Each structure stands twice: as structure tokens, then as C-alpha cells.
Amino acid sequence: MARHLLQLIVLFALAGCAPATLAPPPPTAAVDPYTGERAAMVHEQIAGRGVRNSAVLAALSKVERHRFVPEEYARAAYADHPLPIGYGQTISQPYIVALMSEALEVKPGDRVLEIGTGSGYQAAVLAAMGAEVYTVEIIPELASQAAAVLGELGYTNVHTQNADGYFGWEAHAPYDAIIVTAAPDHLPQALGQQLKEGGRLVIPIGPVGSVQTLWLFEKQNGELTATNLGAVSFVPLTGGTK
């Protein structure tokens, strides 16, 4: 009897020591290796140069700029200069993106038209500020690439179109704000027409291969008034014919 009792005790002890089946650990979020560089960019290059709009600073702190440049330029993504993205186009330097975004005075829910999607970075910044963004790119390959990256990063409030941005995107007009990221030699008439009353339009204007002027146009009583925001250098706006 004592021996049988001892065997039962041993069996229970062994059962208690058996390893439990553990649930697999939850997947870990991908680590962003550029968090520090992005914070330094915002502090030194943007806030340090006078940009004060909290929504702009928050968006630039959040948007992963390195995801919008070719892989070989990822390490330079947060430096304050433009970078090539292919097809003769560039991603604007962070300070210019911030300056133009601040000038638009975008509010959550605003409908914003962007002419010149390029890499998609400017659209992502505006989307992170809460805007509903409609962006037009004339180069099919860039339009496709930008749409793919924006989709991967979850920017559901950005709508892309491969078309000639000189004529805007009339189907979704009027817009609270319009931003143009390439330089024509004049203000396209369609853009002024598609701007909502009280809206703001930021655009570089000037000759190809020379210094251009960044302008802020504000629409009041159907008229556009212009403010000079300073000298800039952008790739030319192509298209403009039907």
C-alpha cells in the first residue's frame, strides 16, 4: 500500500513538472532606425530655422522620409537638401517641405490639391496633418511608386492620379489649399479657378534652370493676392498642353 502511494505521489510530481505549452509571443513592431535622425532634422533644420506650426512639426516628426527615397539614399534622407528620385525629379529638402506646408495653414479635414506627387513625401506630410489629399503626377512610374509607398504606410487619405497637373484635378474642386512642387513660368489659370474662396495656394514660379520665387496666393472675393515667400529652386513643371 505504501509503495503504491509513493508511486502516485511521484506521478503527480512529474505531471506538475511537465513543461506547459506557451502561446507564441506577439509580433514585435519593426524598429525605425532613423528616429534619431528625424528628430534632429525637425529640431535643427526646421524648428531651428523658424517653422513654428505645431501640426507641421508633428507631421515631419512622424513621416518616415527614408521610405520615400531610393534605397541607396536612405542614409541621407534626413539631411537638409533635395535628393534624386529618378526620371529627372527630386524630393524637396525638408525645410522647404516644412515652409510650404506651414504657408498652407492646413487644418484637419481640409481638401488639399498637390501638383507634382514625386516621391509622395509631401502628400504624406499633408495627410499626417489631417488633410484629405488629392495629388497629381505626370510621370506614370513615379505616380505608381508613390501610390504604392503611401498605401504600404497606411495613408488612406491620399488619392493619386497620373495626369497633367497643369490643369489641376477638377473633379474634386474646390480645394481649401493647393500646393505645387514644380515650377511653371506663370500661375496656371486652372489652379486659381479650383481654389476655394478663402483658400491658399503655394507655388514656385520662374524660369527653368534659374532661381525662382515661392509665392503664396490667397483668394478673397474671387481675386488672388500674392505674397513673396523668398527665392527657391525647383524642377520645372511639365505638361500644360491638351
Region locations from a protein language model:
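Conserved alpha-helix/loop element of class I SAM-dependent methyltransferases that forms part
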Residues: 40-43, 48, 77-87, 91-109
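Conserved nucleotide-cofactor-binding alpha/beta core module
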Residues: 105-225
